[in-house]
């Protein structure tokens, strides 16, 4: 995480903690000529628009006092959605028995992408059951080889 995002996280975390919300992720991205600071929040049962607005107002006030971002940007606060990213240890633990999408930095047994049920996670290894054509395969993926992971919607 960049130094700027770490500073933003230090500003946002007390706000989400106060409102009993989980800070899922922070992204600072350029789209066309515009920059966006995106803050993703959640809680059991999901967040509503009023909670997103409350976080947005409080973060905006704090960022006006001491903003680590020098250029102009748009602030967006939202839910991570149904395909929320898995980043923290707790995210992976909570995703056990759920359908996930995982990519790796390098091929593991000839694959760099898996989509299936996360059977277990022990802190170092993800065990995923995938369907390859008509057969089920169990794959072990070392956590340190995971480039990205998220919940996925199964069709």
From Swiss-Prot:
Gene3D superfamilies, per the entry: Ribosome maturation factor RimP, C-terminal domain (2.30.30.180), RimP-like superfamily, N-terminal (3.30.300.70)
Membrane-spanning intervals of the chain: none
A GO-annotated cellular component: cytosol
Keyword field: Cytoplasm, Ribosome biogenesis
Cellular localization per UniProt: Cytoplasm
Keyword Metal-binding: no
Any GO BP: ribosomal small subunit assembly
SUPFAM superfamilies: YhbC-like, C-terminal domain (SSF74942), YhbC-like, N-terminal domain (SSF75420)
Primary location group: cytoplasm
Family statement drawn from the similarity comment of this UniProt entry: Belongs to the RimP family.
HAMAP family: RimP
Function: Required for maturation of 30S ribosomal subunits.
Protein name in UniProt: Ribosome maturation factor RimP
Source lineage: Bacteria, Bacillati, Bacillota, Bacilli, Bacillales
């Amino acid at each position: 995480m960049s130094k700027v995002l770490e500073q933003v996280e230090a500003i946002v975390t007390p706000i989400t903690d106060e409102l009993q919300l989980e800070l899922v992720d922070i992204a600072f991205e350029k789209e066309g000529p515009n920059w966006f600071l995106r803050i993703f929040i959640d809680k059991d049962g999901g967040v509503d628009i009023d909670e997103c607005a409350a976080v947005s107002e409080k973060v905006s006030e704090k960022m006006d006092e001491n903003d680590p971002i020098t250029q102009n940007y748009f602030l967006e606060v939202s839910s991570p959605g149904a395909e929320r990213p898995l980043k923290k240890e707790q995210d992976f633990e909570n995703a056990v028995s759920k359908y996930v999408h995982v990519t790796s930095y390098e091929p593991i047994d000839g694959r760099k992408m898996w989509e299936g049920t996360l059977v277990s996670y022990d802190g170092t290894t993800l065990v995923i059951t995938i369907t390859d054509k008509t057969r089920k395969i169990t794959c072990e993926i070392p956590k340190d080889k995971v480039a990205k992971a998220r919940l996925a919607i199964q069709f």
